[in-house]
Amino acid sequence: TLSSSSAASDVYKRQQYASAERVDVVGPKKTLTGVSILGPVRSATQVELSLTDARSIGVTAPVRESGDIAGSGACKLVGPAGEVELTEGVIAAKRHIHMTPADAEEYGVKDKDVVSVKVDTDGRSLIFGDVVVRVSDKYALAMHIDTDESNAAGCGRAQMGEIVK
C-alpha cells in the first residue's frame, strides 16, 4: 500500500511499517515524488492518494476501503528498481478507525460498524461521517484520515475525537 498522506510515517497498525524506500506516482498531468511505501507486502499493489493529489496528477481515485481496488484508477510507479504500469489500484482510502477488541468493547462498536466521529478544533470543528470501524488484535487505536480531511478540520498530529455514532 502506498500513501501520499503526511501521516504515512505514523503507521499505527502493529506489525506494519513505512519503508525507507520511496517511489514516484506518475499520472497524465504530473508526478508525485517521494511517496511512502507501506508494508508488509500485499497480494496486489494499491496506491492510496488524497483526492487532491489524485486530481492534481490526473488520475481517478474512488473512495474505497483498503483492498477494494477492482475497477479503480490507474497510474505508473517509478522507483530505484524500475517502473510498473498499474491498470488499477489507485484509491482514496475510506476514513476508518483501527482498534483492538478491547477498545471495541469499551466504545460499544464491532468490526465493520459505520460511525461518525466529532473532532473539536480551534475554529474548524466538524463531524466525520461514514467512518468504518476495523477491529483486530493487531491494531492500535487510531483513526485514519487523509491530508485533505485533516486539513479541513484543522487537526493536529495528536487530535482527539469522539465517536458519536
Enumerate the predicted regions with their spans.
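Composition-driven recognition of glycine/serine/threonine/acidic- and proline-rich low-complexity segments
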Residues: 15, 22-30, 38-42
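Glycine- and charge-enriched low-complexity intrinsically disordered segments
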Residues: 143-165
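Short, Lys/Arg- and Gly-enriched loop/turn segments at beta-strand edges
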Residues: 34, 122-131
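Extended, positively charged loop/linker patches that create polyanion-binding surfaces
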Residues: 61-119
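Short, small-residue-biased leader/transition segments that mark boundaries at the very start
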Residues: 2-12
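Short conserved beta-strand and strand-loop elements enriched in small hydrophobics
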Residues: 21-27, 74-80, 112-121, 159-165
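Ordered, amphipathic secondary-structure segments that act as subunit-interaction surfaces
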Residues: 32-80, 84
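Conserved "landmark" site that anchors the functional core of diverse proteins
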Residues: 1, 16-17, 29-32, 60-67, ...
